Structures are given as C-alpha cells and as structure tokens.
C-alpha cells in the first residue's frame, strides 16, 4: 500500500531525477549474515540477472522464461503487476524517477515501458546485450555492452536511437582507455561513471567527459585485496563503493581507508549466508541489501543490522512493520 511518505519520496525523486536508494552507510555498517529469499526460481526462473529496487522500495524483476516484468510494491507479499514483454533472457533493467522501465531485450535493443503501458517502445539500438543499464539525472541512458568491451550512452532528448561511446575503445585490454567484458555501471550526480570491469578484476572510474579510467578497486588500485570479476557496482550516499565480487561469491564495501566483505563471506553454496555468483546489487531506503544470487536461482535480501560503530539498527522493528 502506498503511503504519504512514499508519495513524498517519489516527488523528491522526480525533482532531483534519482529513482534509486543511496543510504548513508558508516564504515562500520553491518548486515545480518543470513539472507531472506525474496524471489525463488518458481517466481523468476533460472539464473536471474535483471533486477531493480526503486526509491519507494518497489521491486522490479524479470521472469525470463515467460518474458515478463514482475512488479512488487513494498508491503505486498505477491506480485501486484505483470508486464508481458518482447525479450529473451534480459541482462538488465532500470526504472526512472518517472516510473518508466528500461529493459535489455536480448535482441540488441533497449525497450521502454511507461508507467501504465503494456507494450514497449525501442529507445536504444545496440550491437549486443546490455549487461547493465543506468539512467542519469540528465536524461541519459547508459548501457554496458560487455561483449564489445564498451559502455555506451544515449541522450533521450535526442531523436536518434544510436548511442555514443562513454567508456572503452572497443578493444579488449587493461589499459586505462580499455575494458574487458564490463558489467555493472553506476553514474553519480557529477556524471562520473563507475564500471565493474569484470575480466580485468577491477572497478574503473571515468570522470565526466574523460576516456582514461582510474582504477578505484581491484587490480592496479591502492587496495591490495583481490576481486574476481566484479559484476555490479553501487555508490552510497557517503560515497562508499559496494561491489558484487562475482567469482569470489561475496559483496564488498570499499571506503576511503578500508576494504571488507559484508555478505557471502563464507564461500559459495545455497546456504542462506552464502552466495553463488552474485550479479546485481541494490538497496532499499532502509539500507537493506538486495542481491541477485544467480547460480542459486534466487533474489535475496540482507537486512541492515548496524549503521554506526557499535550501534544496533533501532529502525529494524519499524522497517519490518512497514514491509508487512
């Protein structure tokens, strides 16, 4: 059920153009180690990738074998809306502040479904699948074209559907202007682009308008801890970096002076405190962390336990009540 608080949040998001949550986490924030299953293979099928949580905690996911987008608002136990689309095994989706849904179709294009529509409109044509999508505050859509080692972008104020290059020169490599099978992307309010550079085992930062990246995590960074095929990257409100470290089956947090595992820190399996190829990462407004646990065929949630050094999450009881 949508509340006045939800309405106020959505109005704020429309004003600043941000549709996702960026909680302010401390360097000591912790999450309960045992995850809750949000969607199993019975709901979303096998090996999920495309997933999104918006600013009022509505969950968007894809049932891949039925070409459906499933929408579950906060407070609902079941799916409230089903959108039948024309796509096959989409890798990514993103929802704008206006409620428009952008989805990788698997047919070398990105389609948009407006808030109340039942059919999609093609807004971007690409040469391969978009392994990640992002919509910035300047009405620009970004696509991580992993198989072509590039990130491309398109202003939706233009009349074309052909994007331009945002990062990567199209050659597989580890130089500062190259990427190797990039996956997750994130664009901050300064239009700086973060890229999970999977096969280079690093996260690259491309300042707005620049094509030479700076390594901020992984190989070549100041952090000595190894990462293995990062697949998703998120920046929180405190500018801490969260990374789905896919082949290490964990989620890590990077601050200005620390690097630590925060979820899936005990190997890979189907046990609730372990992950198996996490691919997509998102937060709700309470700071809970949602992860597509790909090879366990599920989407899971890790509940925030503490958000300051030594302090228990006093909002836990309230958030549980709000989500009922």
Kindly give the residue locations of the regions a language model identified.
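Structural signal for beta-propeller blades
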Residues: 67-70, 108-111, 149-152, 201-203, ...
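Beta-rich, blade/repeat-based domains predominating
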Residues: 44-56, 86-101, 126-141, 172-192, ...
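Blade-level signature of beta-propeller repeat domains, shared across WD40, Kelch, NHL, RCC1
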Residues: 276-324
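A short beta-strand motif characteristic of beta-propeller blades
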Residues: 36-41, 78-84, 119-124, 164-175, ...
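Blade/loop signatures of beta-propeller domains
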Residues: 11-34, 159
């Amino acid at each position: 059920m949508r509340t006045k608080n939800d309405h106020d949040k959505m109005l704020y998001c429309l004003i600043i153009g941000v549709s996702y949550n960026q909680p302010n986490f401390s360097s000591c924030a912790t999450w309960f180690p045992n995850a809750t299953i949000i969607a199993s293979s019975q709901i979303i099928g096998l090996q999920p990738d495309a997933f999104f949580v918006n600013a009022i905690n509505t969950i968007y996911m894809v049932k891949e074998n039925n070409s459906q987008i499933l929408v579950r608002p906060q407070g609902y136990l079941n799916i409230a809306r089903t959108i039948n689309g024309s796509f096959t095994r989409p890798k990514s989706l993103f929802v704008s502040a206006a409620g428009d849904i952008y989805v990788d179709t698997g047919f070398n294009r990105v389609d948009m479904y407006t808030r109340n529509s039942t059919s999609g409109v093609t807004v971007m044509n690409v040469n391969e699948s978009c392994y990640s999508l992002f919509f910035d505050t300047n009405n620009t859509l970004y696509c991580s074209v992993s198989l072509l080692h590039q990130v491309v972008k398109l202003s939706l104020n233009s009349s074309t559907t052909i994007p331009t290059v945002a990062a990567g020169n199209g050659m597989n490599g580890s130089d500062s202007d190259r990427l190797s099978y990039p996956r997750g992307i994130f664009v901050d309010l300064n239009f700086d682009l973060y890229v999970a550079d999977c096969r280079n085992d690093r996260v690259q930062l491309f300042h707005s308008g620049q094509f030479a990246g700076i390594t901020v995590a992984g190989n070549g960074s100041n952090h000595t801890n190894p990462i293995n095929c990062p697949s998703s990257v998120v920046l929180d409100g405190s500018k801490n970096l969260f990374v789905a470290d896919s082949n290490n089956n964990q989620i890590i947090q990077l601050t200005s002076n620390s690097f630590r595992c925060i979820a899936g820190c005990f190997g890979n399996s189907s046990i609730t405190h372990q992950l198996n190829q996490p691919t997509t990462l998102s937060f709700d407004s309470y700071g809970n962390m949602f992860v597509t646990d790909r090879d366990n065929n599920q989407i899971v949630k890790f509940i925030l336990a503490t958000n300051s050094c030594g302090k228990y999450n006093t909002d836990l009881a309230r958030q549980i009540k709000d989500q009922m």
